[in-house]
């Protein structure tokens, strides 16, 4: 990861974290819906 500013902006951390959380929840519910279960 290229860190040019010396410090990662807080909004960037929040955005990435939000995307990851939504992605994990989406994958979990999609897996449960398609019958894969909790294969994580």
Curated annotation (Swiss-Prot):
Record membrane topology: Single-pass membrane protein
SUPFAM superfamilies with a match to the protein in the record: Photosystem II reaction center protein J, PsbJ
One Gene Ontology term from the biological process aspect of the record: photosynthesis
A Pfam family it matches: PsbJ
Cell compartments where the protein resides: Plastid, Chloroplast thylakoid membrane
UniProt key word Ribonucleoprotein: no
Gene3D superfamilies: 6.10.250.2070
Protein family: Belongs to the PsbJ family.
Stated name of the protein: Photosystem II reaction center protein J
Organism whose genome encodes this protein: Sorghum bicolor
């Amino acid at each position: 990861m290229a860190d040019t500013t010396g410090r990662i902006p807080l909004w960037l951390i929040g955005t990435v974290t939000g995307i990851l959380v939504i992605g994990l929840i989406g994958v979990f519910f999609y897996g449960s819906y398609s019958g894969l279960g909790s294969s994580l």
